[in-house]
């Protein structure tokens, strides 16, 4: 298909396997084939390599691996966009093993959009208790109220939901509707960076655009759900952040990072997480059988949660 990709102007992108800088010429609109050629110059491996059947070699390996190693998860047994949405929001900041039971409990009480929309916010928060990052629950509730009982069916509409970003929208649309949108999360960054040997920082503007384009190029458009689920599982199980299983990796023979001995160095992040210490001093007040608590009104991640009287200080 002859679609176009808007390309950023006069940027310098660094290749893991070239000492020289690759100058990105100034384009306003560049045909996709030209962009693929640029990806080829950045990556050690030709991103367009295909099998005899015309399928991308990388994508085929990911899908074949997934068919043999996929994790059995309850939200994968349905193409219901509502259930997929709930699972993706839960997994934004929660490990799969921890989120499993919470997902089942949540959908048992709120099995569809309307039941969630009709619920009281305090009840929604109660069923979210233990997952943390409670703004996710508030966003779910607000988004459900905006749907009028029907989950949206287009990518722009899904993306417009409160609390839904590009990754979540791509996951929902590919898993529920079979739409060709590539997911890009931490697992995808890691797999693509290592396999293609790209050391452009994943948290830079250039890196985000580059990896989004590379992910889109690798996407199997005939099986987007299978491929997206596959590459995420591959990153979570096979190509892990620490101690990846390179010995039994189906991509080992053509992995740039492995051949260069740089698996532990990729992907690259340019900014380290800044940690700020906060000190909460809670006051326990009890009168007979009653304990004093109040609802937190501050506009932060704990908004509308109940807590003991609090004094926050800058030192311990």
Feature map (PLM): residue ranges:
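Intrinsically disordered, low-complexity segments enriched in small/polar residues
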Residues: 2, 12, 41, 63-64, ...
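Ser/Thr/Pro/Gly-rich low-complexity, intrinsically disordered segments
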Residues: 2-3, 23-26, 48
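Intrinsic-disorder-associated, low-complexity terminal segments enriched in Asp/Asn/His/Tyr and depleted
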Residues: 2-4, 14-17, 40, 52
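Polybasic, lysine-rich low-complexity intrinsically disordered segments
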Residues: 11-13, 18-22, 31, 45-46, ...
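Leucine-biased recognition of intrinsically disordered, low-complexity hydrophobic segments
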Residues: 25-28, 37-39
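Intrinsically disordered, low-complexity, charged terminal extensions of DNA damage-control enzymes
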Residues: 33-34, 40-71, 77, 236-316
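Catalytic cores of DNA base-excision repair glycosylases
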Residues: 56-61, 65-245, 251-260, 264
């Amino acid at each position: 298909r002859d679609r176009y990709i808007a390309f950023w102007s006069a940027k310098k992108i660094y290749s893991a396997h070239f000492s020289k800088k690759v100058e990105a010429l100034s384009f306003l609109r560049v045909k996709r084939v030209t962009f693929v050629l640029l990806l080829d110059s950045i990556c050690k491996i030709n991103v367009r390599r295909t099998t005899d059947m015309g399928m991308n070699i990388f994508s085929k390996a990911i899908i074949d691996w997934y068919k043999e190693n996929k994790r059995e998860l309850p939200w994968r047994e349905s193409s219901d966009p509502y259930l997929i949405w709930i699972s993706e929001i839960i997994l934004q900041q929660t490990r799969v093993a921890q989120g499993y039971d919470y997902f089942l409990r949540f959908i048992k009480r709120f099995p569809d959009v309307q039941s969630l929309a009709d619920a009281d916010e305090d009840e929604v928060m109660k069923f979210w208790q233990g997952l943390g990052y409670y703004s996710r629950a508030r966003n779910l509730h607000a988004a459900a109220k905006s749907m009028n009982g029907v989950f949206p069916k287009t990518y722009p509409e899904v993306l417009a939901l409160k609390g839904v970003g590009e990754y979540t929208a791509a996951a929902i649309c590919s898993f529920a509707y079979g739409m060709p949108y590539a997911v890009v999360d931490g697992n995808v960054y890691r797999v693509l960076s290592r396999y293609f040997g790209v050391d452009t920082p994943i948290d830079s503007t250039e890196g985000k655009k580059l990896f989004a384009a590379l992910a889109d190029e690798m996407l199997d458009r005939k099986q987007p759900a299978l491929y997206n689920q596959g590459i995420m599982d591959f990153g979570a199980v096979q190509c892990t952040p620490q101690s990846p299983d390179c010995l039994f990796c189906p991509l080992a023979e053509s992995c740039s990072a492995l051949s260069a001995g740089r698996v532990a160095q990729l992907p690259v992040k340019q900014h380290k997480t800044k940690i700020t210490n906060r000190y909460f001093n809670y006051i326990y007040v009890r009168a007979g059988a009653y304990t004093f608590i109040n609802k937190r009104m501050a506009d932060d991640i704990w908004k509308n949660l109940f807590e003991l009287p609090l004094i926050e200080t800058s030192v311990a």
